[in-house]
UniProtKB/Swiss-Prot annotation:
Pfam families: DeoC (PF01791). InterPro entries: Aldolase_TIM (IPR013785), DeoC/FbaB/LacD_aldolase (IPR002915), DeoC/FbaB_aldolase (IPR050456), FbaB-like (IPR041720), LsrF (IPR033673). Belongs to the DeoC/FbaB aldolase family. The keyword Transferase applies. It catalyses: dihydroxyacetone phosphate + acetyl-CoA = 3-hydroxy-2,4-dioxopentyl phosphate + CoA. Involved in the degradation of phospho-AI-2, thereby terminating induction of the lsr operon and closing the AI-2 signaling cycle. Catalyzes the transfer of an acetyl moiety from 3-hydroxy-5-phosphonooxypentane-2,4-dione to CoA to form glycerone phosphate and acetyl-CoA. The lineage of its organism: Bacteria, Pseudomonadati, Pseudomonadota, Gammaproteobacteria, Enterobacterales. The keyword Transcription does not apply. GO terms for cellular component: cytoplasm. It is found in: Cytoplasm. Homodecamer. It comes from Escherichia coli O139:H28 (strain E24377A / ETEC). This is 3-hydroxy-5-phosphonooxypentane-2,4-dione thiolase.
Length: 291
């Protein structure tokens, strides 16, 4: 119990200065609860407003694909260079050391595989477990225009509703079926629907024509997917174009861990996302770091 002796009245109330309430500036997130804003502030660097996520959740439907055969050997050395880790709860518990001390976005949809229809997903994580694992967000695919569009949207709604109760953001990931065209019109539709359902972050693909319109039409932050493995210079150009056109970061997997020099590539991506380096400058950094 505090000592009650010698209690003195406060005097320095600065009555001439109004209380300062610093606004939360992340796009579309100013009205969220404190806990959710706190988690988002761990995902997005408060100084730059951007993020570099390392995605290695591919095994939930692809199995041990190239580069992800051994998470402990191939991916663990990259943890310190990422802002955020994106993975499944199985990998988090079995491979990621708790002392890593990086914010985690947990894969929350699944129940599909590359052997069947990819869009046929269900919610694969309870919000209780997401909280138990101290995650900063959960992520689920949304397949607009697919056979299972309705179910994938319901999955997002379910996660958003559960997340609002505990201050857990939901990231909607726009999946694309084999027969869908990857263009501005489609991604504008998909990202807007996901945001309208309440997702606080949207992960989508970069397109060369009209990406700035996708960003402008989406009321919450967009991070781009890395997609298939590209030559390092091309991947850095994609990053730069996306950030220049309004994206709030990248969530890259194969373009990092399938690179011949993944640590150097991670540092180059960080330079683009957080230090506004051009693709040329970032590629020079990559070349110097890989030696």
């Amino acid at each position: 119990m505090a000592d009650l002796d010698d209690i003195k009245d406060g005097k320095d109330f600065r009555t001439d200065q109004p209380q300062q309430n610093i606004p939360f500036t992340l796009k579309g997130c100013g009205a969220l609860d404190w806990g959710m804003q706190s988690r988002l502030s761990r995902i997005f660097n408060p100084k730059t407003g951007n993020t570099v996520m390392l995605a290695f959740d591919h095994g939930y439907f692809q199995g041990p694909t190239t580069g992800l055969e051994r998470i402990d050997i191939n991916i663990a050395p990259l943890f310190e260079h990422a802002d955020v880790l994106m993975c499944t709860r199985g990998i988090l518990r079995s491979v990621v050391p708790p002392a890593t001390n990086k914010p985690v976005v947990l894969r929350a949809s699944g129940a599909n595989s590359i052997l069947a229809e990819l869009s046929n997903e269900a919610v694969a994580l309870s919000m209780d477990d997401a909280v138990r694992l101290n995650s900063c967000a959960v992520a689920a695919q949304v397949y607009i225009g697919s056979e299972y569009e309705h179910q994938s949207i319901k999955n997002i709604i379910q996660l958003v509703d559960a997340g609002m109760k505990v201050g857990m953001p939901t990231m909607a990931v726009t999946g694309v079926g084999k027969d869908m065209v990857r263009d501005q019109r489609y991604f504008s539709l998909a990202t807007r629907i996901a945001a309208e359902m309440g997702a606080q972050i949207i992960k989508t693909y970069y397109v060369e024509k009209g990406f700035e319109r996708i960003v402008a039409g989406c009321p919450v932050p967009i991070v781009i997917a890395g997609g298939k493995k590209l030559p390092e210079r091309e991947a850095l150009e994609m990053c730069w174009q996306a950030i220049d056109q309004g994206a709030s970061g990248v969530d890259m997997g194969r373009n990092i861990f399938q690179s011949d020099h993944p640590v150097a590539m991670m540092k180059a991506v960080q330079a683009v996302v957080h230090h506004n380096e051009t693709a040329d400058r970032a590629y020079e950094l990559y070349l110097s770091e890989k030696q």
